[in-house]
């Protein structure tokens, strides 16, 4: 049913019906507005989004752009952490009466183009390099909140991040308490930067505090090509054994869970033969067996914090850029062997 047909059935003008749809109720009685709403609901009327934007003079869209490091577009949204983050953002955006426009970008130029062409009230941009964030701020006037972007100390940008250093430091301290002294750090970058570099730094800090020196030989890089990673995990295991490593600390749950699955298929026992840890506490870490020992981050809180920061900018209540760092905690699964007692940890308690 059209607006004209609804108006004729109620004996009101099309302008009156349109005013109810677009929320312009200043010159209308509550009774008339309620009558029109009831008729709209009765016929399941869905207003045209473009018309609503024109009527209000702005959009109701929050743009979400993801460009997490070293992620191919076809892979980025399959990463459980990324998909969980996007789902949490969409839920928070919808709960506040807005709509989500999503794009998985591959290049800085693409991000710049999208930011200029989207009719969005603001942008939440995830996983950019710091130089890309700076460039983006120069080419768009839209309010922007960054998520997991790593700026130099003293730089002032709206960013919601995680205590990545602290999280990996906690994990390394946990492993040290269980008697592990020789550890292999596993990532997917030949030269670590961004979040991966922060996590490695936390690992190094914990080792140094325990009087142990980290060596570059104790870093193993796996391929981003999924077809090659089976061979990589086999080489990783052989390399860890040559170095005498008792545990592999993975940069993310995604790779840790994939490695456990591969190793179990090869008859390698986790944690009896080698211990494995992850980072993120995504859904895969909770369903894999043995359950993964990992670092938890609250993705829902991160999404809500980013959105609230954006709304503070829109409402002009944010006087200056804010950089927020969210805490982490250890999730103790059963993928790590307790070397002190030569037994396996079988607890799901959190530290």
List where the protein language model places each region:
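N-terminal helix-turn-helix DNA-binding module of bacterial transcription factors
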Residues: 1-60, 343, 348-351
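Short beta-strand segments enriched in small/hydrophobic residues
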Residues: 18, 54-75, 174, 182-189
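Alpha-helical recognition/docking segments in bacterial nutrient-uptake
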Residues: 61-173, 236-243, 254
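Short beta-strand elements in bilobed, periplasmic/extracellular small-molecule ligand-binding domains
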Residues: 90-104, 200, 204-228
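Periplasmic-binding protein-like
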Residues: 117-126, 184-187, 219, 241-253, ...
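Hydrophobic alpha-helical segments within soluble ligand-binding/sensing domains
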Residues: 160-185, 201, 228-237, 297-315
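An alpha-beta-alpha
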Residues: 169-210, 322-335
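Flexible loop/turn connectors
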Residues: 233-351
């Amino acid at each position: 049913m059209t607006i004209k047909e609804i108006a004729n059935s109620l004996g009101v003008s099309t302008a009156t019906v349109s005013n109810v749809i677009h929320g312009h109720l200043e010159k209308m009685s509550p009774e008339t507005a309620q009558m029109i709403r009831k008729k709209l609901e009765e016929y399941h009327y869905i207003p045209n989004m473009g018309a609503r934007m024109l009527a209000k003079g702005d959009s109701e869209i929050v743009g979400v752009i993801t460009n997490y490091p070293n992620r191919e577009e076809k892979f980025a949204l399959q990463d459980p952490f990324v998909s969980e983050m996007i789902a949490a953002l969409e839920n928070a955006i919808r709960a506040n009466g807005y709509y989500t426009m999503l794009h998985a970008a591959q290049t800085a130029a693409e991000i710049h183009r999208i930011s200029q062409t989207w009719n969005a009230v603001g942008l939440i941009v995830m996983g950019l390099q710091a130089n890309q964030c700076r460039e983006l701020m120069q080419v768009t006037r839209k309010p922007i909140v960054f998520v997991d972007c790593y700026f130099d100390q003293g730089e002032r940008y709206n960013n919601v991040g995680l205590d990545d250093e602290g999280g990996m430091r906690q994990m390394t301290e946990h492993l040290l308490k269980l008697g592990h002294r020789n550890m292999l750090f596993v990532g997917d970058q030949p030269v670590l930067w961004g979040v991966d570099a922060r996590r490695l730094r936390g690992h190094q800090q914990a080792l140094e505090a325990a009087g142990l020196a980290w060596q570059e030989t104790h870093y193993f890089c796996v391929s981003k090509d999924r077809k090659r990673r089976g061979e990589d995990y086999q080489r990783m295991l052989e390399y860890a054994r040559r170095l005498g490593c008792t545990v592999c600390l993975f940069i993310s749950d995604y790779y840790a869970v994939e490695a456990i699955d591969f190793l179990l298929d090869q008859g390698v026992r986790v944690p009896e033969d080698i211990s494995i840890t992850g980072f993120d506490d995504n859904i895969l870490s909770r369903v894999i067996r043995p359950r993964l020992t990992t670092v938890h981050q609250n993705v829902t809180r991160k999404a809500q914090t980013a959105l609230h920061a954006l709304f503070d900018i829109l409402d002009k209540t944010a006087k200056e850029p804010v950089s927020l760092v969210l805490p982490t905690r250890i999730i103790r699964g059963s993928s790590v062997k307790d070397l002190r007692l030569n037994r396996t940890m079988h607890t799901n308690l959190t530290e």
